[in-house]
């Protein structure tokens, strides 16, 4: 959903678009709530309130002021992520395909021969980090850039087994044009940048678990973050390999040697960060042309000092010369050294060339060892070739993708490796490594152990659900870690599957009720965005690849109606009710009937069940941005701080009724996951609320009327407004509550329209207009620790006779209250009040 705020209506009609005019009779929160439950994708918001826009954005719903037709046309035709704190829009718009154009935000790609393999007549355009170079295309009242690129296709091709790039590109573009937009992947880079800068403003020590290559630029400027990944491939791991021969396989049609070198250096940078938590100087030998340095400098300001007889245009300091052993003393501490020296083969015979390469490999290793043998805070990444070698057993082996699989690979060494025991590795084993192992991640840090860290803020995005982790250990970490943002895969199955297949692994699935957290927010991706200053135009869909975002230790926990709130809670219900269901009242009818309340007159205005909780349960796959457990808990302890809107505090029994309705809904839908979720939410309600029932009552509250439009044979027909189980010394407490409620009690617009047999020999009249006041009265008694109401649903009725009678229907008749009293069952009246 996107909300585009206009001062004036527009003449043009757009598909999937609805107009909402600000309702001045309602406050900004109520307007925001009504907007959020509209069912179209585009909302044109007229006569808008800036505060309402702010409320929507905090809820993760993109809402932007529009000042021109061009702004409207641009935003209505595509999806986007919005940084509402600095008024920047990141478009995810692929309409540039109509210019016969693909885009990249990695400069090195433009220096390859990739254009020879594009679709006929197509070109490649460099657009800068997150499309920053496109800002000049949009002369808008807000900052706007198009973050959409085709780097995902290019990178997927590089790691695939396919060689024909044009065929691969064509298939992927067609897929993109015929499937829904992977909105979270597109906005994730924007989110990660905002997230980690926000966290580091308030937390000095941050742990990040499970980063992948898509984050490789994000953390270049954040050296103090401690990374955990899947670990490195070490020399000692080669013992499992069987010897092989040279393969000579082509990986890419266009030259990706630049990409390989960039990955090698970035891997080394992050390895250095995890040791020293600061930025190193970067020395490079055999550096030309290293166009990728430009890419790294777009994200962070590194000092590159390079040696090569050829130019290295983006280096900070370039020595246009060869590097010799005597130059090692020029290399400072707090640095990394990348050795990529190799002489061109020219016309050399392959045997002679092989000797040169092996000699150069030994020379490269000697430079590395000498560099690491003195000084401090040093890491080296060195090019090696498959040959008989002795290497430290803790050497980290790298084999990032390159244009052709030949004989080369790389090794990362640190000052500790130099003094570690060495192992002889034969040439054939190195070929087995080269032929079979691809380094898929620039993050080669050790795996994260599922233990709390009291002084650290832990971030684990899409990293802990894998079934090689203990599910209970993941739950324990989330329950016990004081400060964190952790995601887990949401249980989106209908059979309540404990784990699901994802790509080539299995993930555990989770529901919010799996966690016993207090002070945590459990929400969706878009709900989490709102907490960190972003919003999005396309809300999470139940794709099966959905995650719960669990935020521990946030100062926004008590801001119940601002973040992870109830915005959009009824949107899915509206979509169904007004398009597919038997009636738009179907939800109200079902909730009453499933709780044995058969009086459906006015069910849409006087329902006996919490619609919020019911919708949050049965449609949790669509509206899990709303943190239901937090909402229940804060109400239970009386700390539901609400800024605005039509606020109605539910009685705890209404929440129980909602769970019962949701369970029956789940049974009818054969939805075992909702069934368990509803059961567990009901159990949670009973834990946080101390609900007691007057199932063996000794007092009741009665209402007498001046007019009863039916025949009756009881002495005085009355409406029982509720029963109590109290001791005699609590009578005054009950009377105090009744006196406080007196104005509302006498304002009740009670009416009746039919009679029926409540049970054998009990003939009653229905009573409408009672429930909302009953639940308010229930809440007041609950807060006063007075047992009021039974475990079965309260059905308002007036007893007319204790004999069988025929049903009577009349026009709805208003009943006037004459008195309200408290009476002991089979005893005397102890309190009576009249208007």
Curated annotation (Swiss-Prot):
GO terms for cellular component: viral nucleocapsid. The keyword Cytoplasm does not apply. One of its GO terms (molecular function) is mRNA 5'-cap (guanine-N7-)-methyltransferase activity. The active site is at residues 718, 720, 797, 799. Residues 246-428 are annotated as: 2'-O-methyltransferase activity. Residues 171-245, 429-555 are annotated as: N7-methyltransferase activity. It catalyses: a 5'-end diphospho-ribonucleoside in mRNA + GTP + H(+) = a 5'-end (5'-triphosphoguanosine)-ribonucleoside in mRNA + diphosphate; a 5'-end (5'-triphosphoguanosine)-ribonucleoside in mRNA + S-adenosyl-L-methionine = a 5'-end (N(7)-methyl 5'-triphosphoguanosine)-ribonucleoside in mRNA + S-adenosyl-L-homocysteine; 5'-triphosphoadenylyl-(2'->5')-adenylyl-(2'->5')-adenosine + 2 H2O = 2 AMP + ATP + 2 H(+). Keywords: GTP-binding, Host-virus interaction, Hydrolase, Inhibition of host innate immune response by virus, Methyltransferase, mRNA capping, mRNA processing, Multifunctional enzyme, Nucleotide-binding, Nucleotidyltransferase, RNA-binding, S-adenosyl-L-methionine, Transferase, Viral immunoevasion, Virion. Residues 556-692 are annotated as: GTase/RTPase activity. Pfam families: Rotavirus_VP3 (PF06929). Contains a bipartite N7-methyltransferase domain, a 2'-O-methyltransferase domain and a GTase/RTPase domain. The C-terminus contains a phosphodiesterase domain that degrades the 5'-triphosphorylated, 2'-5' linked adenylate oligomers produced by the host cell in response to IFN stimulation. Multifunctional enzyme involved in mRNA capping. Catalyzes the formation of the 5' cap structure on the viral plus-strand transcripts. Specifically binds to GTP and displays guanylyltransferase and methyltransferase activities. Has affinity for ssRNA but not for dsRNA. Capping activity is non-specific and caps RNAs that initiate with either a G or an A residue. Together with VP1 polymerase, forms a VP1-VP3 complex positioned near the channels situated at each of the five-fold vertices of the core. Belongs to the rotavirus VP3 family. This is Protein VP3.
